[in-house]
Design a protein with these regions (language model features):
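Hydrophobic alpha-helical packing elements
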Residues: 13, 114, 168, 209, ...
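N-terminal Rossmann-like NAD(P)+-binding domain of SDR-like oxidoreductases, especially those catalyzing
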Residues: 1-195
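C-terminal substrate-binding subdomain of Rossmann-fold SDR/epimerase-dehydratase oxidoreductases
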Residues: 59, 69, 76, 215-332
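Short alpha-helical
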Residues: 12, 37, 102, 201, ...
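Hydrophobic alpha-helix immediately C-terminal to the catalytic Tyr-X-X-X-Lys motif of short-chain
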Residues: 171, 175, 179, 209, ...
Length: 332
C-alpha cells in the first residue's frame, strides 16, 4: 500500500486529491493549518483528527493499528518540527505538497509572510524529505509565466513573474531542479492553470472567478467583474488536476524538478462566463464592475503536450461540463 502525505489536504485541491487517493487504496495523512482549509470537505471519509503536530508524534509512538481507509488529519503547519520529523523518518512514499499562502493580491500586500511559507518553509519540507521520500509532487502555478508572449504557452516559455506569489512559485521550481541535480531528489512541479469546481468556496483567497460568482449567486450578492472582462483564462476542472497529481506520482519517470502545464488547453473570457450565467440564472446575476487588479495577467492558455508525453495527462472534463458540475455542488 502506498503512503502519502497531502499538505493543505483540507483545502480545495488537497481535499479532492485526498478523497481520490483513499478511493484508490492509498494510506493518507493530511496536514493543514486550517487557515484556508475546511474539515467538512473530508467529512465523507473515515477521519482521525489530531489537533497539532505533538499529538501526531504521540500517535506514531503508540504504533496504533490503523484501518486501511482511515485518514489522519493533523491540524498544524506543515513545517512543524513534529511533521518534519515524520517526513525525515521515511513515513511516506509520496508527498503531495499543495499547501501555500495564496494568492496574487495577498502576496502583493504581504510579500514577507508569503515568502516565508511559500519559499522558506517549502524548502524545509523538501530538505526533510531528502533521502526518505520517493517523490514530491508539488503545486506550482501558471502565474510564473506572467503575461506570456506565446499562447498557447509551453513550458519552454521564459518565466516572467509579475507578483510576489508568482516569483515564489518560480523560485521553488528553480530549487526543485537544483535539488534534483545536487541531491538526486525526485520532485515534479505541476503548473496549475485556473482550477475550479466542487469544494472551492467562493470567499476563499484561492477562489477563481467561477467559484466567487457561484457564491455570489447563491447568496444574493453582486458578481465582481474586474477590468473590461475581456481577460481570458484556461479554466481547469478539479478532476483534471487530481488526475494529473496521481499520474505524476505513479510515473516511472525520474523527475529532476521538471515542470508541467496542467490545464484544459482552451481559454474562456470572464464576459463569456458571466453571459452564460446570466442566461442560466437571469436576474440573480448582478454584475459589479471594478478596476483591473494589480499583478493579474490578461490571458492564459496552456499547451499540455509535455505532460501528455511524459505521464499521459490529458483533461478528463472540459470547461462547460465542469461548470455544470460546479453549479450542482453550489445547489444554484
Amino acid at each position: 500500500m502506498k503512503k502519502a502525505l497531502v499538505t493543505g489536504g483540507c483545502g480545495f485541491i488537497g481535499s479532492n486529491l485526498t478523497k481520490k487517493l483513499v478511493e484508490l487504496g492509498w494510506q493518507v495523512d493530511v496536514v493543514d493549518d486550517m487557515s484556508n482549509g475546511h474539515l467538512e470537505l473530508l467529512e465523507d471519509l473515515n477521519l482521525r483528527v489530531l489537533i497539532n503536530g505533538s499529538f501526531y508524534t504521540a500517535y506514531k509512538m503508540q504504533d496504533v493499528k490503523r484501518n486501511q481507509d482511515e485518514v489522519l488529519v493533523i491540524q498544524d503547519d506543515f513545517a512543524d518540527d513534529n511533521i518534519l520529523a515524520g517526513v525525515f523518518q521515511g513515513t511516506y512514499d509520496v508527498i503531495f505538497h499543495q499547501a501555500a499562502v495564496p494568492r496574487v493580491s495577498y502576496s502583493v500586500e504581504n510579500p514577507y509572510h508569503t515568502t516565508d511559507v511559500n519559499v522558506s518553509k517549502t524548502i524545509g519540507l523538501f530538505e526533510a524529505a531528502r533521502g526518505s521520500v520517493d517523490r514530491i509532487v508539488w503545486a506550482s502555478s501558471s502565474s510564473v509565466y506572467g503575461g506570456a508572449t506565446n499562447i498557447p504557452t509551453r513550458e519552454t516559455e521564459r518565466k516572467n513573474p509579475i507578483s510576489p506569489y508568482a516569483w515564489q512559485k518560480s523560485a521553488i521550481e528553480d530549487y526543485a531542479k537544483l535539488a534534483g541535480q545536487l541531491y538526486d531528489q525526485d520532485i515534479v512541479c505541476l503548473r496549475y492553470f485556473n482550477v475550479y469546481g466542487p469544494g472551492q468556496y467562493g470567499d476563499s483567497p484561492y477562489s477563481t472567478a467561477v467559484s466567487a460568482w457561484c457564491h455570489a449567486i447563491a447568496n444574493g450578492l453582486e458578481c465582481r467583474s474586474d477590468g473590461d472582462g475581456m481577460q481570458t483564462r484556461d479554466m481547469c476542472y478539479i478532476d483534471n488536476v487530481v488526475h494529473a497529481n496521481i499520474l505524476a506520482a505513479k510515473s516511472k519517470k525520474k523527475f529532476i524538478g521538471e515542470c508541467y502545464n496542467i490545464a484544459n488547453g482552451q481559454r474562456t473570457s470572464n464576459n463569456e462566463i458571466l453571459s452564460a450565467m446570466k442566461e442560466r440564472f437571469g436576474e440573480r446575476v448582478k454584475i459589479k464592475h471594478a478596476p483591473e487588479r494589480k499583478g493579474d495577467v490578461k490571458h492564459t492558455q496552456a499547451n499540455f503536450q509535455k505532460a501528455y508525453s511524459d505521464f499521459g495527462y490529458e483533461p478528463l472534463v472540459f470547461f462547460w461540463e465542469g461548470l455544470e458540475e460546479t453549479y450542482a455542488w453550489w445547489k444554484i
